[in-house]
Amino acid sequence: MNSSLTINSIVSFAVAFLLLHFINEYSTAFAASYFGLKPIMYVHSIKYSAYDMWTPYNVKRVFLISGIMNLVLGIIFFRLFMRVKEKNKWYRIFFLWCSVVGLIMFLGKLLAVPFYEFKPDPPGYIAFGVVAAYKYLGLSVKWMIAGFSILLMIAGGLFFTYQFLRNAESKDQLKKGEFRRNFIFKVILIPYLLGMVLVAATNFPNNIKTLIIYFFVGLLIIISSLIFSSRTIKVLLHKDEPQKLSFIGIGMLGVLILFYLTLYAKGIGCKGYFDFLMCCDCKG
């Protein structure tokens, strides 16, 4: 199996995660600014200045929008994955990882519902938990939501099994169950684990709870795919396409890491719909 495929998968996952995490935080802060909550966006959390503006109406909309955004982006990126030609291997696996990460973040918010405890500055990963608390849902209902999210993770693993295998270089290799399992293991699971380590080391020193929840969700999806890949699956590949190392992906990852580390170390402020600031002096 071509090692370039594994490297490209690691890079694609890291780029996808960093990109969608930023969009997730930005959408929450943008919604909060619309309701006059005066948010300040940090690398690892969002602070709100106008606490008197929190109402049940505002809470539901501010903390629902990021989860819905994750799901919508996941669907959009999956459609892009389906439209990209097979010869553009890196773009295909990048869009596929973006779709998977969108689902991971959406299901992570559902899974975290029972573990929510109110805090003045609730972090984004328990966004649905905030809404559940304000709607006074009982603990049994919250656990039902979490259980439903686990079922969706397994279903997601089944759905993405076929899509993961469509990134293989040769259709003849996919006829063997052992190759399919090795492909999921080396091109999906290993890059996922290494990509999460890279993301954690780069950007989230104070956001470990979020990463743990996302890590569990993604791991369950991929392990489900690994199990389902043992079945006989006919994967449609129009022709064999060797994988080459993507310098575009590596460049994108480098730019994103530099973007995050620069903002985290020095801080950048600008005026818009909300005050946008990232700095390392603020602990959330």
Where are the predicted features?
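Membrane-interfacial, low-structure loops and terminal tails that flank and connect transmembrane helices
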Residues: 92, 164-185, 234-244
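Membrane-helix interface motif
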Residues: 30-40, 107-126, 264-273
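Hydrophobic alpha-helical membrane-insertion segments
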Residues: 13-26, 96-112, 257
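Metalloprotease/metallohydrolase-associated module, dominated by Zn2+-dependent proteases
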Residues: 52-165, 182-196, 221-224
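Juxtamembrane "helix-exit" motif on the non-cytosolic side of transmembrane helices
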Residues: 83-84, 110-113, 195-208, 230-234, ...
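Final/C-terminal transmembrane alpha-helix of multipass membrane proteins
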Residues: 11-16, 20, 243-269
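Small-residue-rich helix-interface/hinge motifs
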Residues: 4-5, 12-64
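Transmembrane alpha-helical segments of integral membrane proteins
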Residues: 222-236
